[in-house]
Amino acid sequence: RLGAFIPTPGVDLDKIQEFLRTAQGGVFGIINLFSGGNFERFSIFALGIMPYITAAIIMQILVTVVPALEKLSKEGEEGRRIINQYTRIGGIALGAFQGFFLATAFLGAEGGRFLLPGWSPGPFFWFVVVVTQVAGIALLLWMAERITEYGIGNGTSLIIFAGIVVEWLPQILRTIGLIRTGEVNLVAFLFFLAFIVLAFAGMAAVQQAERRIPVQYARKVVGRRVYGGQATYIPIKLNAAGVIPIIFAAAILQIPIFLAAPFQDNPVLQGIANFFNPTRPSGLFIEVLLVILFTYVYTAVQFDPKRIAESLREYGGFIPGIRPGEPTVKFLEHIVSRLTLWGALFLGLVTLLPQIIQNLTGIQSIAFSGIGLLIVVGVALDTLRQVESQLMLRSYEGFLSRGRLRGRNR
């Protein structure tokens, strides 16, 4: 949060914040949300970590299209390390482009409308903005990688999670202020809060829901010992893709808004920005479609029925009533496709409903939008699972170390 209070040199923050409160500035809401409110402060983290996520989406597409990258992705840990390095470079390059674009098309527009006295739009100011934003993105990437490596959970997701959650209290306080002035009805506000609580409960239940496919292992008699014969299961989650499709959908939705919104005097570009604005019906519909699409795509990447079927056959396992090999692959594909359909429809519904409730109650808050709530719930549950697994691992380590100590004392 310290970086949120380090502004970009030469930018008039009061004018930026005043503009973002207008109808024209409202299209920047989703960019401001995923930067943790840093865009309205135009701090060194104004672009957030979204340039890196956009680069990651582009890289995943290139891996499936470019044979050299596809081959590299199959070379194990070393190949993944090189692809990650390419993604980092792409994220920083994209951040530099976005910083330059903002400096020229937005901040420097109309003779420097958003600049402090003594500053003027030109090469020096453009250079300062680009260097500041690239440094901010590089620092966020470094922190995300350190969190992933030494902390608990995915660093990139946790940074986005923190950026959304930190906006909740200001949004609630702002709404309470509107209640006092009579602009928002108290009953509508209580209804909105009740819906948020129910939405959290429903999302958590669906994120945890899974279909358990029974697996039986054949018995093997070696001498006087019997091996195998255990019964277990394959857990397939209703939402196997997790929170990644939602983050990817938000990243894609930001691109046309980011490119069109700064041109305030161009009605065509403003129309494009408004069309993709997730608070409008058109933008909300596109957002739902993107969430459903990325859910299917990422589930296909994460869950490989062929690999699971081969693993079962290798270790003597089988699904009761299903023959090993190709029948098992087809059975798993059928189950996954059905679960993914319902999971994707649920994610689409949850993306849609909060905006409808906001329109009905008159409480507009992008921090409590469907996409924001889904990210918060998904990241929180993923992190909680990792914390539980770490605690379990530590308890086993403690048990084993005590056993070793007792053995030495004998």
Give the label of every model feature segment.
Residues 1-71, 78-410:
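N-terminal cationic and glycine-rich segments that engage phosphates or anionic surfaces
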